[in-house]
Every structure is written in structure tokens, then in C-alpha cells.
Amino acid sequence: MGLLRKRGDRVDRRRASSWALANPAEYALIFGSPVPGYTAPPDTLPAATRTPRALLQILIDGVRSGALSDTGPAGLPDDVRADFTRIREEHLPDLPEALMARGFLGRTHLFGAVSFEVFGQFDEVVEARDAYFDFQMRQVAELVGL
């Protein structure tokens, strides 16, 4: 979490979670079960990619500032490496493979945690949800290298 503290911005670090809890139906439309045969209109793409882009930008900023470095190969299976190579070439040329892989892992954990809370998976299990969410995100930040 050192890099996040150094960034100096005071954004609400629970923004994705807070929005999802306040707007569960909208969250479900974006991140819930797909509707067979439905393709979202192109104008919805910016909203759907806002959080992933912000997460990746934190990693890119960390690389550019020298606070994050490539830790070598990500250990990706070859077919996944091909996917990530394509994504990096098209959208994220400044992000080393290992950091990109960890960033995607962080995104998966973030939305998994939010989805568990929004869809009631913690009901009658975890009462201190804010504290648990913060704990999860600290663990994910460490895993990602932040």
C-alpha cells in the first residue's frame, strides 16, 4: 500500500464498493450474470471500464515513477501470455507483463469481493464488512505490489 499512500490523492478507496452497494441493480447489469443474446451499447463501455482503467493507471504511474518494477516473467501459461501480449501491444505498452498479470488479478479480487457483498454472500457470515473489505484490499494491494 506504500505506492497508494505516496500518490497523495484522497479518492474514496471504497468507491467501487460504495457505488455497487448503493446501486445493486446497475452493478448487476454491468458485473452480474450475462443476458443471453444481449450486447451492451458501445456508449456504455467508458462507464464499464472506469474502475479497471483507474487500477491499471495506478500501476502505470508506479512504473513511470520507479516505485514499481517488473519482477520478471509472470509465469503465465503460453496461451494466456499471448492474450496479455495482445492487450499490452494494443492498450498498455508501458506496463510490464508481470505487473499487468498482477493488475488483472487485483481487478478480479476487487470485483469478487464487491460481488460477494452486493449479492449477499457475506450475510450472516461477516458482520464487520467495511473492515473485512479493507483487509481484503490491503492483501490484494500487497499481492499486486502496491
Name each model-derived stretch.
Residues P41-P42:
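Divalent-cation-assisted or electrostatically stabilized phosphate/pyrophosphate-binding catalytic cores
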Residues A28-I30, V118:
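Short amphipathic alpha-helical segments with coiled-coil-like heptad repeat character
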